[in-house]
Amino acid sequence: LNKYIDEKIIINQLQLSITNTGMIDSGLNVNMKINSSIDRDGSILEYCRLKDITIQAWSPFQYGMFEGVFLDNDKFPELNNKINEIAAIKGVSNTAIATAWILRHPAKIQPIVGTTNQNRLKDICKASQINLTRQEWYEIYRAAGNKLP
């Protein structure tokens, strides 16, 4: 697309959440014969990083395309237990931790939170002050059912 337009593309909005990690999975599971090593996104994460295109994550609290929110959802007990455990340690909400998980990625991904509720927005903004450790980030990733090599 950049080849055919005058303006440089600087942002790409993509679905990404703790439960929608395809673009992350394929980069972690390189050269393996497992489902999560299949590149279904055309290496978009790596492409955007190389071309200085900011990824904006839409539906950062959703699982699937239209199924619903994973936070406080009975379908994700291990994930919610891990998020709530870290939230309690850091003194913030589970929403702030889910947002911080996206912000912690080295690609400097920007979440699009899509709320009009001022209190929820203030709560989400606390994520920018949370410093998830690498271990916490991977614990959350694994609690969502993702595997590491």
Give names to the regions the model predicted.
Residues 1-149:
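Beta/alpha (TIM)-barrel catalytic core signal, keyed to glycine-rich beta->alpha loops juxtaposed to Asp/Glu
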